[in-house]
Amino acid sequence: MKSSEIRQKFLQFFQSKGHTIVPSSSLVPANDPTLLFTNSGMVQFKDVFTGKEARAYKRATSSQRSVRAGGKHNDLENVGYTARHHTFFEMLGNFSFGDYFKREAIQYAWELLTQVYKLPAEKLWVTVYQEDDEAYDIWAKEVGVPAERIIRIGDNKGARYASDNFWQMADTGPCGPCSEIFYDHGPEIWGGPPGSPEEDGDRYIEIWNLVFMQFERDAAGNMERLPKPCVDTGMGLERIAAVLQHVHSNYEIDLFQKLIAAAARETGVKDLADNSLKVIADHIRACAFLIVDGIIPSNEGRGYVLRRIVRRALRHGYKLGQTKSFFHRLVPDLVAEMGEAYPELAQVAERVAQVLRQEEERFGETLEHGMKILDGALAKVAKGDPLDGTTLFTLYDTYGFPVDLTADICREREVEVDMAGFEAAMQRQREQARAAGKFKMAEGLSYEGAETRFEGYENLELSGVKVTALYVEGTQVEQVSAGQDAVVVLDATPFYAESGGQVGDTGLLEAGGVRFAVADTLKIQPGVFGHHGTLEAGALKVGDTLLARVDAVRRARTVRNHSATHLMHKALREVLGAHVQQRGSLVDPDKTRFDFAHDAPMTAEQIARVEAIVNAEVLANQATEAKVMAYDDAVKGGAMALFGEKYGDTVRVLDIGFSRELCGGTHVRRTGDIGLFKVVSEGGVAAGVRRIEAITGDNALAWVQDQNALLQRAAGVLRAPAHELPERIAQVQEQLKALEKELEQARTKLAASAGNDLVATATVEVKGIKVLAASIGDVDPKALRGMVDNLKDRLKPAVVLLAAGSADGKISLVGGVTADLTGRIKAGDLVGFVAGQVGGKGGGRPDMAMGGGTDLAALPAAVASVQKWVDERL
């Protein structure tokens, strides 16, 4: 039975049992930055199981694309070494949301396996949780599985309810016992049943896990029964296919055999059992579908996991002797194998191949060199010693080798790696980066008081704020004198502290004769705002009360840019695709600078579309709304959360126009306050990362006015209205080309005339051969070459060398030898001989060569030496 048929029969079976077929969700979990990848079928139903979301159906079935690489669930290092580990796999599942429970789940599973897939009942074993008598009785009394093939598994992980047969979503929340179904391959395969000392063998293979969510676990570990228990089951397509296709390795099923053959074709390998081919076949599936879902290779988060998988595949290709790009050429084979089940793959296959090809080219530049470094280091490692952390770090930092890739190579050669040394090298680099950072005093100042109360969302001026701490050169003090630079901590402030890419506010702290100019605002600790600046007048003491006033003009420009950044982020995703993710940002009064994941330069048309979308939102003049709510409620409501950011239980959600993001920054009250949005630059900053800069409000107006003034000046110079400039510039270019052609013709005539003079005045005969060597003033090298060609034809057999010295002191040399003489005299040798005398070099073909030099004073003697040089060679 083919894998496609197994998948189809599974979905159709549960559809016949009243289940709704739900398409596979993205490998990027929707609005859940805490989870790296979708790694099981239940992920897209998580909020349904917890009661936070309601669906129109109570029974569902799906074939879910899943990835287990990176993060908590990571099978990457095992791929290629075992028969059943994959980075990408398909999870077949059926789900009940408060509808049926254990009895139906067990009966459905048994019916599908024995009646639809026709597996022999005597080959199936099951496990249940030690205390789950209900499931045991259903298997034994209703399904009829003999007691000797039902195994109770207790708490085998060191704690209550810590068992292979007890599932929990997290430390708290829904949980419950599970029942696993195993297939017995027979006594000819080594291994024992689950729970036995030999359970790690390959005889008994788990094919299906039925999870019964019947409890709610609180923080104290207490278990309460759920009023509406749920069912979550998962069966790996690759595993059940191996059973139904009568093979013992997932890599022997039809899904993999064609991909392995394709990998062999592209690497030139004949042995289809080579483990490296299995790695490549596995990795093309993971890489392609990650790109389908908008992830591109990068140096952080999900993008870095993708990069690690790609580079691991390339390394295995290199191991097989393939040093050229090959990985991207497997995409059509993957589409042929899986495109029907997942049409989204076929739709973006060209883009998938493009992204992979770019990553191959990027890593290919360093792979060979890095492997030489690693091979050399491994050759020096004494038996039993690890590869040192410094080499690990060098390969990572300089040659782009993910540390797990290096560890994988070392594992093949039975060498351990010094991870502690690697981490130490990483830490040293971080400390050096911090030491070179802009704000050395921004963090880590000793402070034990209350957090600063921020009131800058609504107020730019706040009276009666109290000084709670003062710092001079990093040391806490009680008083600051006029002229000193210091950091002031207040109990409350309207000043925004640098965070989330937005720069800190500037302004004044005043009281009586005291005046402190705030040059920047930074957090010295989480929740504690440090006002960095200079005391311009008076004396400032801890406990003093001040008036805090933010620079309103600067803040207004900053908030315009920050709000525009949100709109631009959304517009970029609309124009370029959902793979666009923030990689960094800087929002200051002058501009917004936004780094984002994308693998190609934006076209002028794409930039114009982004501008149009953002300015349409500006013109709509919609009110900006900020709400503080629970994090789970925020992401459920569609707020964009950034992967890798740390969020608390309570977050601030900003709605501005069509954008909804988690953001603690300051913003305009209405989109119309942005005024005008204009992109001023777009370029690359790193592999797979683009940077776009834009301006707003009065800055954008000033930019437009400057551009218009420049346009008007150009129109004045060309004596044409601005709207006719393209045509007028084209006319000028045509006129310039015509004049250049006329000039070239004039030079040719002049050169011909000069040639006539040279023939008459500078030609000598050496052993029956005409030799002409002369310096003719400032002549274009191209014209000089034409003259040499002309003179060769007129004088043959002949040797010709012409030199021209320009006003800037550069010498051009052209030498020519007629074809009948190149066996004895070569133009390249001649030009090299002369160029060497004038401080230069030269070379070329035997019949024509060019060179140059810089010593004008030596040129006459060098030219005069040609006659003797030729004579010596005849």
Swiss-Prot record:
Recorded catalytic activity of this chain's protein: tRNA(Ala) + L-alanine + ATP = L-alanyl-tRNA(Ala) + AMP + diphosphate
Record-level GO BP terms: alanyl-tRNA aminoacylation; negative regulation of DNA-templated transcription
Residues holding Zn(2+): H562, H566, C663, H667
Documented EC number(s): 6.1.1.7
Top EC category: ligase
Superkingdom per UniProt: Bacteria
One Gene Ontology cellular component: cytosol
PROSITE patterns reported in the protein's UniProt record: AA_TRNA_LIGASE_II_ALA
GO molecular function: alanine-tRNA ligase activity; aminoacyl-tRNA deacylase activity; ATP binding; tRNA binding; zinc ion binding
Cofactor note: Binds 1 zinc ion per subunit.
Entry's localization field: Cytoplasm
Annotated PANTHER family: ALANINE--TRNA LIGASE, CYTOPLASMIC (PTHR11777:SF9), ALANYL-TRNA SYNTHETASE (PTHR11777)
Function: Catalyzes the attachment of alanine to tRNA(Ala) in a two-step reaction: alanine is first activated by ATP to form Ala-AMP and then transferred to the acceptor end of tRNA(Ala). Also edits incorrectly charged Ser-tRNA(Ala) and Gly-tRNA(Ala) via its editing domain.
Domain remarks: Consists of three domains; the N-terminal catalytic domain, the editing domain and the C-terminal C-Ala domain. The editing domain removes incorrectly charged amino acids, while the C-Ala domain, along with tRNA(Ala), serves as a bridge to cooperatively bring together the editing and aminoacylation centers thus stimulating deacylation of misacylated tRNAs.
Record-given protein name: Alanine--tRNA ligase
Source organism of the structure: Bordetella pertussis (strain Tohama I / ATCC BAA-589 / NCTC 13251)
Gene name of the encoded protein: alaS
